[in-house]
Amino acid sequence: MSSKPLILVTNDDGVHAKGIRHLWQSIQDLADLIIVAPQQEQSAVSLSITVRRPLHIEKVDWLNAQADVWSVNGTPADCVKLALNVVLPKRPQLIVSGINRGTNAGRNIFYSGTVAAIMEGVMQGIPGIAFSYGDYFNPSYHLIESFIPGIVNYALQNAMQEGTFLNVNFPKTEHGPIKGIRLTTQGKEYWAENPEKRQHPAEQNSYYWLGSKLAEYDEREDSDIFLLRKGFATVVPLHIGDLTNHSHLLKEKLAFETFVN
């Protein structure tokens, strides 16, 4: 290893996804990079971990790339756990995840394996950045690569508060160039319940696919959802910490404990 900072690179689209190669390529001059990513796509697995079967770590050869790459037959959170405890020679200064094919903005972060990989690191005291790109069907990663080094370099040079990480989303670029980057707040949008009922052609039982309908809201003008629709890239500082609703606790503690005891 050199004297450069060490960055762990991961994702949820899988170790051979184009997005992670573009992420690696965009920041390879900033730090020593080690890639530990899922063997297969693990989209929408959130912060799940594998506990009912063994996990395997395998060295991966990226053609035409001098990269240190490993795959894990598990989830993004599994990858981070094994990277920190088995693969990496030392503690990384930063973890980056992505570039995800499709945005992870609003409340969709709770489903995202891309974001969950960073959350796993944050819970172990390591800051991180999740990167996602709105062009799902035909992502032109080269159009957003130039924005990534500045964001990563800022994170390397400016310590985040404990429990904090950055969630970065790039808008679709099919309608024009990105207008700029905004540090902003999380919106409300998420994938709504929209199950599609289907009939098996050879069997009599029905089955369902969860649809891709979005639950839309009137978004604040400083939210990531609103700004992405306007063509801006968004950076939201998210926080993992005490989830207790303290105002509810203070208001209801006496009444609740009197009622149930």
From Swiss-Prot:
Pfam families per UniProt? SurE
Subcellular location field: Cytoplasm
**Any single GO CC term annotated in Swiss-Prot or TrEMBL for this entry:** cytoplasm
SUPFAM superfamilies membership: SurE-like (SSF64167)
Q: What is its main location?
A: cytoplasm
The cofactor remark states: Binds 1 divalent metal cation per subunit.
Keyword Lipid biosynthesis (UniProt): no
The entry's a divalent metal cation-binding residues are: D12, D13, S43, N100
Alphabetic keyword roster: Cytoplasm, Hydrolase, Metal-binding, Nucleotide-binding
Q: Which reaction does it catalyse?
A: a ribonucleoside 5'-phosphate + H2O = a ribonucleoside + phosphate
GO MF, any single term: nucleotide binding
**Cofactor(s) this protein requires:** a divalent metal cation
User: Per its UniProt record, what InterPro entries does this chain match?
Assistant: SurE, SurE-like_Pase/nucleotidase, SurE-like_sf
* Class in the EC hierarchy, top level: hydrolase
| The protein's Enzyme Commission number | 3.1.3.5
Family matches, as PANTHER family = 5'-NUCLEOTIDASE SURE, 5'_3'-NUCLEOTIDASE SURE
Primary role: Nucleotidase that shows phosphatase activity on nucleoside 5'-monophosphates.
Q: Which family does it belong to?
A: Belongs to the SurE nucleotidase family.
Protein name stated in the entry = 5'-nucleotidase SurE
- Organism of origin is Protochlamydia amoebophila (strain UWE25)
Protein encoded by which gene: surE
